[in-house]
Amino acid sequence: MAILKICTYPDPVLRKETVAITVFDEKLVKLTEDMAETMYDAPGIGLAAPQIGESLKLVVVSTARREDSKQEYMVMANPEIVEKEESQVDEEGCLSVPELLAMVKRYRKIKVNYQDINGEPCSMTVEDRFAVVLQHEIDHLNGILFLDHLSSLKRNLYKKKVKKWFLPR
């Protein structure tokens, strides 16, 4: 396994359209293992393929119950939200949007159709924090960052902060 480079805002790969996964092979297994290792090393609780420069509809999410438990994760290929209910506001951060935590409104309960690592169709209904994590990661597959859910004022303040990071000293 390998730790991959995480692409950060404003890298254009984060805004690219992703393509569906059609081949489920050892190469995909290796990619998901590397993504999981990268996610846990960061540390994070979810990672989408665009965040490591791959324009694929692929997500890994932590299923560990506590931070100190072993590294358990699930793979979701071609995930799609097919049902959504209610809303909630929760704090989010993103490995691709460093140094920003913000309150974001999301659905409280969602149903997601996806394929597992073997290409088998699956469906799951999730609530609360896990629903937030999945919506956040699926947004990445559509070129959407959690930054896009913020007010224009907060978004512009963050963009100015990022520009300062790249100014010559």
Swiss-Prot record:
Statement: the UniProt record of this protein carries the keyword Lipoprotein: no
EC annotation from Swiss-Prot or TrEMBL: 3.5.1.88
Cofactor binding remark: Binds 1 Fe(2+) ion.
Necessary cofactors: Fe(2+)
Enzyme class name: hydrolase
Reactions catalysed: N-terminal N-formyl-L-methionyl-[peptide] + H2O = N-terminal L-methionyl-[peptide] + formate
Molecular function (Gene Ontology), one example: peptide deformylase activity
Biological process per Gene Ontology, one example term: translation
Active site location: 137
Protein keywords: Hydrolase, Iron, Metal-binding, Protein biosynthesis
Keyword Hydrolase on entry: yes
A Pfam family of this chain: Pep_deformylase
Positions annotated to bind Fe cation: 94, 136, 140
General function of this protein: Removes the formyl group from the N-terminal Met of newly synthesized proteins. Requires at least a dipeptide for an efficient rate of reaction. N-terminal L-methionine is a prerequisite for activity but the enzyme has broad specificity at other positions.
Family according to the record: Belongs to the polypeptide deformylase family.
Protein name as annotated: Peptide deformylase
Organism name: Desulfotalea psychrophila (strain LSv54 / DSM 12343)
Gene from which this protein is expressed: def
